[in-house]
Amino acid sequence: MASGEDRISALPEDILHQVLRLLPAHEVVRTCLLARRWRGVWRSVPTLCFTGAKGWGSADRFAQFVDHLLHLRCGGDGAPLDSCDFDFDSDGFMLLPANERHASIWLWKALPRVRALRLCIVEEQEASPLSDMHLFSQHLTRLELVGVGINNSVVDFAGCPTLVELSMDTCDVFVRQLLSPSLKHLRITRSYTSEFDRILISLPNLVSLEFIECRQGRIPFLGSLPRLARAVVVLNEYCADQCSQDRFDSCGADSDICDGCYYYYGDPGHGPHYDRNNCIFLKGLSEATDLELSAHSDVTVFNRDLKWCPTFTKLKTLLLNDWCLAANHNALICFLQHSPILEKLTLELSKGPLYETEAEGIYKPLGQSIASNCLKIVEIKCANVDSKVHKILEILTTYGIRLEQISVQQTSRIPGSGCFNFVCTEFS
């Protein structure tokens, strides 16, 4: 500026806070050297973001800085904190056990003061473990963990009565129970779970659930979720709930032949054991209004649950992929007959022939009636209108759905032209 006037320093403090919250913590602290006006601004910025030891010369110097700053900000006289972010992504800091202990201590220091806490430790190694997940905070509302190893037998967030959102991405989640009386939103993505035991999820106030493309292990066992409104579940080829004998019911083989069935209801040698005459997963989703259930063709858990399929009394929108076409489309028929107020059904079909299996379906259709008189539209999204689509149209019309209610979206009609959509009027 020609006049040399410092207009930035003249801004209100809340505006300065909005600018500084975009910077890592060490750069925020350095602003105290800019001018007299800036000397104390860093002390009241409502966010802290630590970006790892890179550039500090040594991990010890970085650790000393974090220790001192957390002492100043999280002590009794520190200004309130909206959020604290520890981002150690790919800087190597967590490779040393001593630094893992530092991270656990910092988490405990920040926890009582913040409303949102994020810990990110993504490196080319196993997830870094947290020494203790028995957390206590009267203020924490959101917790995000990335690349963290959780090995407690029970993770109980009763000590965080205001926690409403928990997100875990690329984590090792080797726990038997996940409990919280307050949690409303749970997201577990690309994580590792046990191949021998399921996570019992007991969250009476849960509103939304996302369990997406976990890299190992079994789908959780869902307790009662009376407030659940929406769930998105994507099970890929790494899900351990598969039968090596291609059966939807248990093949009865021992662990040398089929781990998928042998450990389906828990480790017979150690437990816990789940009720063999009840759902593992679908019953916990029965209160939802919006469901997306996608699975690799080898995954059996959804089809096994159909034997005890609950009635989805509130379900209005449903998305399924190819897994529902196995065993004479029994899963598709089952959902149609157990969703009395369903308004919209979406079927996302992959390329390739109709999924065939020698296994007999567990669910036996209830005649040829369809439960929902509320159904407005069925959307079929496919690469090509082939025999698979024709078979689905035949099934849908057999169970009372009119062709004019069905919309087919063909995604590969002309390369680069996007989606081709049409409403069915006839098929042969």
Name each region found by the language model.
Residues 1-428:
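Non-core capping and flanking segments associated with repeat-based/extracellular domains
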